[in-house]
Amino acid sequence: MRQFEDYVLESFDHTTGWYQDNSYESLNRTADQLMQFRLPTGLKLSFSSLATPNFSTSYHLGAGGRFDGSICYLFSSVPLKNVVSSSESIPLTALLRSYRQVQDLPPFQPSHGAVPPAPTPTPGERLQEFVKQPWLVFGRMFLPESMLEAQVVKRASPNLRFQVKGVSQADLPNGGTILGSVQYTKPRYGVAGLLSTDGGLLGFRGLYNFGGDTTPTTSSPRAVGGDENGGANGCDERERIYGRFSAGGELYYGVLNKSAGASLGVRFATLPAHSGTPLTATFTLAPLMGNISSSFAVMARQSCSLATRFDFNVYSYESDWTIGMELWGKGRMAGLIDRRLEEEEAQIVPVDMGPAEKKRERSFQAKMEWRLDEDDETEPPLPNKREEEFSGVLKARMDQHSKVGLLWEGRLKSLIFSLGTSVNLSKPEQSFRSLGLAIQYSS
């Protein structure tokens, strides 16, 4: 289960228009979420609130052998008005779904030759424009360890932003560490530079997109085959594949410990306009360590997603595989007992089957305009929550060592719960390892 503060952090990117899929860091995000979901240990309680559209708080309390917890505060310079904060009404798919489909690229900006050049801004105007850009501050304190975590995000322009993360604790070397990054994104590519005080780490990441929607077109893809004559428009419109290839890599070097690392990766993911089955395939290579990894994730149905990963090391000849799945359900067993479904059943009114049709009451708009409704003026039907919203999800994973992880998540009234356990099938005498329950409430 994603924490409420992570959900708000992601909503900040959506509100400010930051494109998240142009980061090499998120290349394997879909497969990782399907096969590396966290299992709760012990009992964990979370209480969160979006007090204002700009400010949110979260409190966590855990009892897994010992009592611990954390306090989180988040402030955004832009109001997050589109965030559904109530745990009673928040869509479960937005909070619990692991399969994340790659979104369409942001619109391409017109070339410099198509628009007249704008006057060069003065340094004062540039500073004023920088101050107006969105920013976010996040802080979290862990108890009783007294560890402090902080994060600051500042947009410098629509395509450039700065991000600083820090952790402070007495047990860490030098009392803590700071990681700073500069991220620049365009519709076709995204790059990032990293600097960390932990070992003097310097890093660079980049991701380039090609194929699919990376080439702007003057006509809409719906025009393909839309003309019955099929002639001119079909010839002028290029063939489009409803998937996008992405290739990138990262390179980092530790100045103090004289260590280096590199990674290369390729991803193919279908786009939302794809009419077939959504899928994501990735391949990564770490040449210095000799690790090769490939993963494949598919949303077989709206209620079922599957993923698999295979890892191999060319130096030690060791291999590893993992499979994962999530299965959504609409019944009561999927989400325990959804009281809203019972309320809907209690509100069902018998339909009058008599020959006389009951006169429909005038709409509110017609009453305000002192007129009668038109014959074809009908109110849109209300969405059926039973059909459009899932009640819960069952997640499972297993590796080659017969270690199984099971997670059951759903909603009970205004509480979102997560019940998980891990089982080792290779050792029947010690098969049951742990059981945990996490409960989250937000308003």
From Swiss-Prot:
It is a multi-pass membrane protein. GO terms for biological process: establishment of mitochondrion localization; mitochondrial genome maintenance; mitochondrial outer membrane translocase complex assembly; mitochondrion-endoplasmic reticulum membrane tethering; phospholipid transport; protein insertion into mitochondrial outer membrane. Pfam families: MDM10. Keywords: Membrane, Mitochondrion, Mitochondrion outer membrane, Transmembrane, Transmembrane beta strand. InterPro entries: Mdm10. It is found in: Mitochondrion outer membrane. One of its GO terms (cellular component) is ERMES complex. Component of the ERMES/MDM complex, which serves as a molecular tether to connect the endoplasmic reticulum and mitochondria. Components of this complex are involved in the control of mitochondrial shape and protein biogenesis and may function in phospholipid exchange. MDM10 is involved in the late assembly steps of the general translocase of the mitochondrial outer membrane (TOM complex). Functions in the TOM40-specific route of the assembly of outer membrane beta-barrel proteins, including the association of TOM40 with the receptor TOM22 and small TOM proteins. Belongs to the MDM10 family. Component of the ER-mitochondria encounter structure (ERMES) or MDM complex, composed of MMM1, MDM10, MDM12 and MDM34. Associates with the mitochondrial outer membrane sorting assembly machinery SAM(core) complex. Lacks alpha-helical transmembrane segments, suggesting that it resides in the membrane via beta-sheet conformations similar to those predicted for other outer membrane proteins and porin. This is Mitochondrial distribution and morphology protein 10.
